[in-house]
A protein has these predicted regions:
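N-terminal assembly/interaction segments in proteins that build large macromolecular machines
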Residues: 2-307
């Protein structure tokens, strides 16, 4: 199978490995992208668990929560230049779209476009009018809507948007202390980028794949290759615990106090407020995540290497 420049660029973007290493891995994997990532990880060349998040698209991410109706929304709207994110009309459109999502609960972006705004026009009409004013291509890319107690947080003027959903008892969500706690958890998600809420939410196939990669790494390391299987199993157990600690929100060290985990901080706040708190789910949007502008010079460089 022919290896293209696009394939090499994408693998490099996601693994931070050198272009020649990426080309070799893709060749060995016969063009299978996932297998190439595994090969690089097994060789210790690629970082585990998380993909690189190089962003190039402009616009903004926004998140908001209505405590009266108990609905939260995080949304991403993309544009061509970074000037747009500072334009009042653009920001107003993003906030209006967020309100529409809260109130009308559209199934997806296409359904959102057909919803009516408070001004009586559809979101699609409002968007087209905005494009005429700003003279840039603008697109609502994605959104997530949660019902129930939430915390919404926007970081970096719209580079990151976080929405965290909770279950609580005894109306503790109305207390200022809970609001502060919710912001802390949302900031934790922004800073530490967990992949899952807890160990139970990590798919079994993900854990199995991690173990497989760890064993392959051990087999290629002279220090561990000849160790007894029982010793290797114990080492794998420790590595999996580390994986959970790094990738599960409740197991992570609390960013504002490294002496406790997020789970311990949650338990402390719940006890202080006289109720119970459970982190149910979260959404973490990064502006332009997975989107790239054209980079002709870099593309030419890669193309010359895969010929």
């Amino acid at each position: 199978m022919a290896i293209t420049a696009k394939d090499v660029m994408e693998l490099r973007k996601q693994t931070d490995c050198g272009m020649m290493e990426c080309k070799k891995a893709l060749t060995e994997a016969d063009g299978n992208f996932e297998k190439a990532v595994e090969i690089l990880r097994e060789r210790g060349l690629a970082t585990a668990a998380k993909k690189a998040s190089r962003t190039a698209a402009e616009g903004m991410v926004y998140a908001d929560y209505c405590p009266q109706c108990k609905v939260g929304v995080v949304i991403e709207v993309n544009a061509e230049t970074d000037f747009v994110a500072k334009n009042d009309k653009f920001v107003d459109f993003v906030k209006e779209a967020t309100k529409v999502i809260m109130k009308q609960n559209p199934a997806d972006v296409e359904a959102l476009m057909a919803c009516k705004t408070e001004a009586g026009e559809t979101v699609d009409e409002a968007l087209k009018n905005l494009i005429l004013v700003i003279k840039e291509n603008i697109k609502v890319r994605r959104f997530t809507r949660y019902e129930g107690v939430c915390s919404a947080y926007v970081h970096g003027g719209g580079t990151h948007g976080i929405l965290v959903n909770f279950e609580t008892t005894n109306d503790i969500d109305a207390k200022d202390e809970f609001v502060a706690y919710g912001k802390d958890i949302a900031m934790q998600v922004a800073a530490a980028n967990p992949g899952y809420v807890d160990e139970a939410s990590v798919p079994a196939e993900v854990v199995a794949k991690e173990k497989e990669i760890m064993l392959a790494q051990m087999a290629q390391d002279p220090k561990t290759a000849n160790k007894p299987e029982a010793v290797k199993a114990k080492m794998i157990e420790g590595k999996i615990k580390k994986f959970f600690k790094e990738n599960c929100l409740v197991d992570q060290e609390f960013v504002k106090d490294g002496d406790m985990t997020v789970a311990q901080y949650t338990a402390k706040v719940a006890k202080d407020l006289g109720g119970e708190i459970k982190i149910v789910k979260f959404a973490r949007f990064v502006k332009g995540e997975g989107l790239e502008k054209r980079a002709d010079d870099f593309a030419s460089e890669v193309a010359s290497m895969v010929k």
